[in-house]
């Protein structure tokens, strides 16, 4: 009965991959195509009713390069509508800043808990850059995109969980993605292990579609991180 209760608790929280309260997070990533690494530092707070906020800071590096600042970001979400104990509709948004300029995104999540051990979130998101880039026609425009994401959350045991996360991106204006087309996929497999009430380490195996310029190879990325809950 203790394990069943723990699984039910995890199921109610895995849709946002969070536990109530404040936390800090550290994550390191490595892209096998670009040979680029990334270090992420994050602080956040999750409220009991499901709302949350987090602040993120990243740095990138190559093997022989110095650490360079990536971006700063603040993100928040709120469970606006919950018609049943299984269905939740949750809007969210974020703003970010990096050396080339600022941007942001708004999204709407729809989560449904099918069983105590499986729930699915479908996300519709619009990504916007406040700065202009040169498009395929040589004109300056905003490289904005529309994104559809799915989060297939599985509770394997009271400590171990897995998320399958495919995302589809479509460039709204005349820009191509790294694969040479107006659209691309990013697929993430996340494995988490809950050590205790404080520590939650995880590993992510990601495929970021094929890059045709300048790497001419599949973009595979490995992320290793941990969260500490207070």
From Swiss-Prot:
Any GO BP:
oligosaccharide transport
The keyword RNA-binding is annotated on this UniProt entry: no
User: Which UniProt keywords are listed?
Assistant: Cell outer membrane, Ion transport, Membrane, Porin, Signal, Sugar transport, Transmembrane, Transmembrane beta strand, Transport
Cysteine-cysteine disulfides: none
Gene Ontology MF terms in the entry: porin activity
Q: Name a GO CC annotation attached to this entry.
A: pore complex
Query: What species is given as this protein's source?
Result: Escherichia coli O157:H7
Stored InterPro entries: Bact_OM_Channel_sf (IPR053713), Oligogalacturonate-sp_porin (IPR009331)
Record-linked Pfam families: KdgM
Subcellular location as annotated: Cell outer membrane
Q: What is this protein called?
A: Porin OmpL
Per UniProt, what is the membrane topology? Multi-pass membrane protein
The signal peptide stretch is 1-20
The entry sums up its family as follows: Belongs to the oligogalacturonate-specific porin KdgM (TC 1.B.35) family. OmpL subfamily.
Q: What does this protein do?
A: Outer membrane channel protein that allows an efficient diffusion of low-molecular-weight solutes such as small sugars and tetraglycine. However, the specific substrate recognized by the OmpL channel is unknown.
